[in-house]
């Protein structure tokens, strides 16, 4: 989906509008986006100071069910968290604005949450209301004066009297808009008509112009307007003005609507009132002197300006990593950007840069940057902390914010909340977190906070008991991955990462955390939170609160994705009160891993039916049936139930472990790791689920299945390690903590899973045993449902794996690691290239592989595992998470893919791949936490992804040595895989193979496709075993890495996140190092690297630091570097598709998959990716940039492509040769303004089409390359992009478009 050009002005925009795709694609290329792309609009709206206005996506949030305004609205509104906009999360950096001012829709949360949230918000709102009221009164007063003046000037004749009355009426409306009245000194002239006409105008035109706004004000209901208009009108104009460039019409429409809405809302909801932040005042432009007065501008600001300034203005590409280094989640940064970026979308002016820096600084201190106007309160410019670190300093603040983190988790989708702008949770839920922070945080924080707190307490005790350091660390790792997510939603871990998570609950939680892990607040808290959750969940297993946060997060996340689904899910949770909290928490939890999971879940929610089933099944086996049915259905109908797919997976899980909804939920929860809380009601189930939860996150039922099966069938295999561990650990699980600790030591993720598994294993063993056994046994026989679920899961896992991988690679460098990301991506890519293109995925897969290797390369496993596992762990397996994530971003596709086991394999695979990337990106944006969070576990892996690459690489290398089959199997994976998978060892191999092929798509494709393709049921189930186990094993291994290492790596990662990332970019050689370093070295290099990186991050002078951060590559090498990453990702996507389809043993199934709607959509996306590679290939030729790696990548892509064409012919999708011929797009010397016409990715003319132009679209409406869609282009940061190039880049390479310049030599 993300790859599809999309229907709006820009494919991206269209995608943005889409629940998942859009967001993913929504890099702030708002310029070309059309209003329809609500997601994009945010970008345009970035300029709006008025969050309210930005709410087009947020309407729901604001309580204005503005959904009508944007189709996204409804989605966005879900759960009060604009899921739709959420996608922006992918590009939260720019597109978050929409959420910026999102107010959580109070009503959307559970009463408890709402209450708490409401109380907090109420105070804030009341204050704002008071301000608004005062302003309104003042305005009214002015208005009255004006009115009197007007009246006095007009002799009140009878006729005039009517007019006066009319005027008065109008004025009443205008009441709050005396200013407007002034603006329209002659309201008398059009007073009569103004009422309706103005209102209409407002609604209709919502002119960006002041007059339009005035009209709006005039027309809007007096009361509403009074309260809201003041802020809103002010904001509106500002917004409009800011937006004007971006999407005048669009913005204005939404803005006006918003204004109205705001007024209504404000009136309707006091909180809403806040929606219109009075601060937005007309004085939007009112900037503190230290922004425009050069003599007062701090040196730090000037240095950053110098670093980023280019002859053409401030280079966003250079600024991005610097901002990312603030440790704020991308979402938050996106909101800040949106608030400040008023002139050119994607580019800041000097003053805007200073504003952004100041807002970042403020946000880091835990004060949400609601609008630039708030800066005027500061006598001197606040100096942001821009280091590689996630800003631990704010943690304390963060903690308060952290709570929102939980909500953030849920909000991650929301992302926008400037409020939470600081939500660390941003990383995953980062985006969400920030949003939540703004509105959700309060209540979620309560919920989450509370729960978290309880959880935390438990955890605290546990931690304090000493497990905190070891266990916690280990656990941390595990949590980092599994709990990290949790913590995110639990909020906190991520929040911690982000200096100002802004989650209050977090704060409490963090307080605990702080006490416990002040030294490593980021990672610890994150893990802690998660751990807390987990433990607590384990402990309380279901503290409702726990559940709640989970639910909350989840719900929120879900809500973001699909309120209904989530709600159902929530219901399913059986802890209805927890539902909302669950929502919140979950998302938070999901923030990182959970976010992805949430996505999956979200997708699930998408499937109302599934969800319903969930709901109905909610508390019992009943669910099973529905799920079974659903799953089967999902499986068959996968397409429809994408969410169902997710849900289906869940359902399958549920059926698999029909133990109960909790289980199901657990599954989802699994994702959240919060599953524990999620199944508050059913401890056993929950335990199951939990066990699953963590383990099964990737393959929930599978986990059990896997475990059981593994236990039964695969105990011997390394994969089984996790399973076995589960089995073995059950004893360990005797004491949750023991298990946890042991597992933690072995692998937090595993521990969690194991533990859960133990807990639930026993239980699960019964429950699952049947299910599992049957499922497992049915792996082959009962594939349909169980397997499917498993397959589903597998796909998810793979996807997850991929995603994790991607995340690390792309999202891996979240926080200030934009470059890091690049570097990461590059490194991953390079690694891939080094490894043979598999490294990247290998990393993620590697973790799978590693598990297979079973500890041979724990560090590698750790890293990769962490990537995978960390994420996987997070969700138990990020796989699920990633899955979810994938689903989330590629919700439709992924969902469908997920739903359709086969599709999961095929479309899903691709989705995953793309989504993965997207998600990764998303995470990336808000990912510093994510990464860090994930990093906790994955952090080391991810965070150390810097280190990771080497670590991973060695691991991989080792892995390779160890499991040569991995690579080999990769080759025959499709064919032999089934066998392999069937055999335990092979399973492992397979996993490894998967790893090998792992490039995002590979992983998903290998694993997923294989399961899907080969034996959906068998393969998947088996595979899931492997996948999961691999993950788990990898996870455990990664955990094995040692908490110490984890922490180190995590801490380093924090640094690494930012600096490491640039270091990564700077030292692409690292991968070589890792590669060269043998597995033994893995740990050392990993460690060293972390240390060096962290030291490096800490030491460099600000100027150098920024230079490092920007990860500047020599210009002549930059093209090769960027294209290498691009082609590497494309190869992954295409290879994943190919492997997926190759993995389907039955040609009938393969044909069915390909010809299904999802299959075709998926393949069209793959075709689109291939077309991007063809464009890039021409760009490479045109610029004469030549490198062996690029040539090899192109060859590999063509090779895989030619293989894939055979499948496409089954669905008449084979692209016309002309559609792949972009020779007419090459920019020849002499073309004026060639520089402006060059696509920032492929350097081809954005206005030219492939030669397929003449082909009428109706001829092959299914083709992605008719001239219509081919013509989509976007503008961002001073560059133009083909929609598909930008879309692909943002989703599969990195969240920030590369902005390549056409070399003058052309």
Curated annotation (Swiss-Prot):
Major localization listed first in the record, in broad terms: cytoplasm
Q: Where is region (Disordered) located? A: 176-196, 252-285, 460-494, 559-601, 697-730, 986-1016, 1065-1090
Q: How does it sit in the membrane?
A: Peripheral membrane protein
Instruction: List S-S links within the chain.
Output: none
A single GO BP? endocytosis
UniProt-annotated stretches for the region Interaction with AP1G1, AP1G2 and GGA1: 661-673
Where are residues bearing N6-acetyllysine located in the sequence? 509, 736
Which chain positions lie within coiled-coil regions? 113-153
Q: Where is this motif: DFXDF motif 3?
A: 767-771
| Annotated segments matching region Interaction with AP1G1 | 514-778
In this chain, composition skew of type Basic and acidic residues spans 258-272, 702-714
Q: Name one GO cellular component term.
A: cytosol
Question: Is-annotated flag, keyword Ribonucleoprotein?
Answer: no
InterPro entries (alphabetical): EF-hand-dom_pair (IPR011992), EH_dom (IPR000261), SYNRG (IPR039656)
Chain ranges of the EH domain: 293-404
Entry's free-text remark on domains: The DFXDF motifs mediate the interaction with gamma-appendage subunits AP1G1 and AP1G2.
Q: How does it assemble?
A: Self-associates. Interacts with GGA1 (via GAE domain). Interacts with GGA2 and GGA3. Interacts with AP1G1 (via GAE domain), a subunit of adapter protein complex AP-1. Interacts with AP1G2 (via GAE domain) a subunit of adapter protein complex AP-1. Component of the aftiphilin/p200/gamma-synergin complex, at least composed of AFTPH/aftiphilin, HEATR5B/p200a and SYNRG/gamma-synergin, which plays a role in the AP1G1/AP-1-mediated trafficking of transferrin from early to recycling endosomes. Within the complex interacts with AFTPH/aftiphilin and HEATR5B/p200a; the interactions are direct.
* Protein purpose: Plays a role in endocytosis and/or membrane trafficking at the trans-Golgi network (TGN). May act by linking the adapter protein complex AP-1 to other proteins. Component of clathrin-coated vesicles. Component of the aftiphilin/p200/gamma-synergin complex, which plays roles in AP1G1/AP-1-mediated protein trafficking including the trafficking of transferrin from early to recycling endosomes, and the membrane trafficking of furin and the lysosomal enzyme cathepsin D between the trans-Golgi network (TGN) and endosomes.
Record protein name field: Synergin gamma
Native organism is: Mus musculus (Mouse)
